Regions:
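Terminal substrate-recognition subdomain of acyl/acetyltransferases
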Residues: 2-13, 23, 159, 164-186
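Acetyl-CoA-dependent GNAT
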Residues: 18-106, 110, 123-125, 129, ...
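Short aromatic/hydrophobic contact patches that present stacked aromatics
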Residues: 106-108, 138-142, 180-182
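Conserved beta-strand-loop-alpha-helix junction that forms the acyl-donor binding cleft
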Residues: 114, 139-150, 167-172
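Glycine-rich acyl-CoA binding loop
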Residues: 115-123
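Conserved active-site alpha-helix within GNAT-family acetyltransferase domains
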Residues: 120, 132, 145-163
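Conserved GNAT acetyl-CoA-binding A-motif
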Residues: 123, 130-143
């Protein structure tokens, strides 16, 4: 009997999904579970007021999946042994004025897989897809301040290009900046 073990040093298997019909019920469930786990552990992943449950996250996940399209929105997943470790969304607006850049949304790593390079691997793959498959020249993202995310993205070549001071009020005594980052060239 051959046992397949995932070592701490192994890299995740990456895949991209461009159509909702490519999402199995199992993957849909894992995406929802990941989003819940990330949010409820304090992650800045689109639901700013934890705790969240399946009935909060499932409709948003379904809406996101329903908008997948090869030229406009792609889902990139990272797995270890068929278990979802993380995911990210690449958005591209084909309108001529802004069609040369894309937007990154919802980067998240399941808490059980943090510290294993999942987020970095997802962002490297997203960059490659944006450049090589969509022909994009730059990527944009916005994220919550005071989470250490600025340093994470900077290590991957991103640079801060702006900040909305006090834009995000998480609690009466917890107001954060939203920072804007750019990756250019790809």
């Amino acid at each position: 009997m051959l046992l397949l073990m995932t070592t701490h040093d192994s890299m995740p298997d990456l895949a991209q999904i461009t159509d909702a019909h490519q999402v199995t019920p199992e993957l849909r469930g894992q995406l929802i579970d990941c989003w819940i786990a990330v949010t409820n552990s304090g992650g800045a992943a689109g639901f700013p007021f934890p705790p969240v449950q399946v009935n909060d996250v499932a409709p948003v996940t379904d809406k996101l999946l329903g908008r997948l399209h090869p030229q406009h929105r792609r889902l990139i997943t990272a797995r270890f042994d068929d278990v979802l470790a993380g995911w990210v969304v690449l958005n591209h607006d084909p309108y001529r004025l802004v069609g040369h850049w894309g937007t990154v949304n919802h980067l998240q790593t399941h808490p059980e897989f943090r510290g294993r390079g999942v987020g970095s691997a997802l962002m490297r793959e997203l960059r490659k897809i944006a450049r090589d498959e969509l022909g994009l020249e730059q990527l944009h993202l916005a994220a919550r301040g005071e989470e250490g995310l600025e340093d994470f993205y900077s290590r991957l070549g991103w640079r801060e290009v702006g900040r909305w001071p006090g834009a995000l009020r998480l609690a009466p005594d917890d107001t954060r900046d939203e920072f804007l980052m750019l990756l250019n060239p790809l």
